Amino acid sequence: MANASLNGDQSKQQQQQQQQQQQQQNYYNPNAAQSFVPQGGYQQFQQFQPQQQQQQYGGYNQYNQYQGGYQQNYNNRGGYQQGYNNRGGYQQNYNNRGGYQGYNQNQQYGGYQQYNSQPQQQQQQQSQGMSLADFQKQKTEQQASLNKPAVKKTLKLAGSSGIKLANATKKVDTTSKPQSKESSPAPAPAASASASAPQEEKKEEKEAAAATPAAAPETKKETSAPAETKKEATPTPAAKNESTPIPAAAAKKESTPVSNSASVATADALVKEQEDEIDEEVVKDMFGGKDHVSIIFMGHVDAGKSTMGGNILYLTGSVDKRTVEKYEREAKDAGRQGWYLSWVMDTNKEERNDGKTIEVGKAYFETDKRRYTILDAPGHKMYVSEMIGGASQADVGILVISARKGEYETGFEKGGQTREHALLAKTQGVNKIIVVVNKMDDSTVGWSKERYQECTTKLGAFLKGIGYAKDDIIYMPVSGYTGAGLKDRVDPKDCPWYDGPSLLEYLDNMDTMNRKINGPFMMPVSGKMKDLGTIVEGKIESGHVKKGTNLIMMPNKTPIEVLTIFNETEQECDTAFSGEQVRLKIKGIEEEDLQPGYVLTSPKNPVKTVTRFEAQIAIVELKSILSNGFSCVMHLHTAIEEVKFIELKHKLEKGTNRKSKKPPAFAKKGMKIIAILEVGELVCAETYKDYPQLGRFTLRDQGTTIAIGKITKLL
C-alpha cells in the first residue's frame, strides 16, 4: 500500500511538472483533455459560479453535445483554436453569457489562440478513433519535444494566424482587431495585457482540468501542496477574486469601445457605400436636372379643387384637347356642363355623378423646370381620413378657398373643412402652403380686391396660429375654370391690383426640396393592389431603390425583393429616388398580408416598431375632456390605428412649455400635455427628432380632429 501511494504521488508530481512545463511553453495540456467526461465534469464545473450564469450553457451541452467526448469533438472542430473560435471561444461565449468575463478582462483572445500552429497540428493528427496506445506514444513524443530548449517566437494573435475560419462571425473579427491594436504598441496597456496572459492561461487550463473527475483531486492538491505550484498558483486566486466583481466593469472597459468602434465603422461603411451607389450628377443627367414635387389640393367641398387640377393638366399638355372635349360632351349630356374639367381628376362614376371627390386622386404633369404629382384630396368631412393619407405624401399644400359669397364663409366657419385641412396638412409635415383664392371671376366677386382681402385676412390669422411661418404662406387670386392665374398671370385688365406670379410660375421657382437620396430607404405604403403579383404604392421618404433590391416590409419583418418599379406616368424605370410617388411590384409577400401603414425599409437600417410611446400632444378641439383610458383614432404617416391614453404625465405651460410636477387628472381643449399612448398592434414609428415624417400624428374622434402630436420617445 505504501509503495502504491508512493507511486501515485510520484506520478502526480510528474504530471504537475508536465503541466508547469506546458504552461511555460504556452501549450495545451493533453492530460486534462484525455479523460474528459461531460457528465462527470459538469457538477464540478457548476461549483464555480462567478455570476451564476453558466447554467445557460446546459452543462457543456453546446460544446460537445455529449458526442465523442472532449478530444474527439474538438478535433472535429479543427483543434482547440478552431473549436473554440467556432463555438465563440472561452472568451467570446463566456463573455456573451456574462459568466466568465473576469478571465479575459486583460486578454480578449482567451489564451487559446496563442497556440497557433504546433499544438493545432498535433491535435489534428489525433484523428477520430485514435487508440490509447497511439495517444500515449504521441504524448511521449510531445514530452520529448517539450524538453528541448524553446525557440523564441513572436506571439501571434488570432487576426494574424493565417487560418481562415469557416464559421467566423463578426464578433470574432471585432474582438481580434482591437487585440492587435492593444498588443502591438509597447506602452503600459499592452504590457499589462501580455503580463497577465500566462495567469489567464493557467486559470483556464486549471478549469479545463477541474472539469474532469480524474484531474479534480490533482487540481486541489496543486493549489495547496507543493511550494513551486503555490508560487505559480498564487496569482490565480487573485484573478479569481478579481473575476467575480469585474464582468460588468470589464464589459464597460472592453466591450463598449469595441462595439462603438464597430458600429461607427459599420455606419461609415454604410454611408460610403450608399454615396458610391448614387451620385447627384447621375440623378440630374437622368431627369435633366428636374426634381420632383408632390402638391396636394385641399379645401372645403365645392371650392373647385378638382376643376383646378384638371385645368392644370390640360394647360400643361398632360391631357390632350380631344380627351377634354370628350369629357365636356359627356358632362353636358349628364347635366353637369360646368364639371367637365373636374372629370379629368374624378374618374370614379360616383364622384362624377355627385360632383364630390371621394378618394385621393393622383395625376402627373411636367413643366420646363420640374416634375409634379397632383394629389386631389376629398373636401367632404366624411373623407377626412383619405385627405390625411394624401397630405402625408405631399411636399407643398395648395389650399383652395372659394371667393363666392356664402361659400367662403361655409368653408371657413366652424364645421367647414378649410380650417381642418390646413391644420392636418401642417400636422402631416406640409410646411409650405399656397392659398389660392378661387372663383374670382364669379359674378358675385368680379375680381374684387376687397373680397380678396377679406378672405385672406381671416385665413392668414388662423394659419399663423396653427404654426405656419409668415414666409411660408403665399396668397394669389385665380380662376380654376377659365385658367386665369394658373399657368399665365392674371390679365391686368381683369385684376389691376395683383401683379404677382401665377401658380405654376411660383411652383417652378420656389426653393428646391431637400432630398435624402443617399439616406436609408424608407417608403410608407399608402396603397396596395394585385396585378400578376403584389404591387404597393407610396412616396419614397428617404433613399433610393433599384430593381432587384432586397428590402424588408415592417412591422412584420418580411424580406422582399423589388421586381419592377413604375414611376408617376406608369412607365417602368430602373431606379426611383426620395420624393417620388412610385408603385413597386414586389416578391416575398402576398397582397392579403399587407395594409396601408406598413413601411418598406432598408434591411441595414429598418424602421422601429412599437406598441407604446411617449408623445407631446396639443388638444385643438374636444367637446368634453380626456383622461387615462381615453380611446380615439390615430393617423400616423399612412397608418390608421386605434390608440388609448395610458398615462397623462405632464401638463405644459403656455408659452414656456414648462412641465408640471404633478400629472394632470384630465386634459381639455387648448391644453398641451405629455402622455403615454398605446396601440393594439405594432406600428412603424420613429421619434419626431430623428424622422419627422414618421414621428408626427393626428388624433380624431367622432369625425373631428381633436389633437395633434409628435413622438418624443419610443417605449
Swiss-Prot record:
Keyword Cytoplasm (UniProt): yes
Low complexity composition-biased segments: 13-25, 39-129, 176-198
Disulphide connectivity of cysteines: none
Cellular location(s): Cytoplasm
Keywords: Cytoplasm, GTP-binding, Nucleotide-binding, Phosphoprotein, Protein biosynthesis, Repeat
tr-type G domain residues: 290-515
Residue numbers binding GTP: 299-306, 376-380, 438-441
Chain intervals for the UniProt region annotation (G2): 355-359
Role noted for this protein: Involved in translation termination. Stimulates the activity of ERF1. Binds guanine nucleotides.
Name recorded for this polypeptide: Eukaryotic peptide chain release factor GTP-binding subunit
Organism phylogeny: Eukaryota, Fungi, Dikarya, Ascomycota, Saccharomycotina
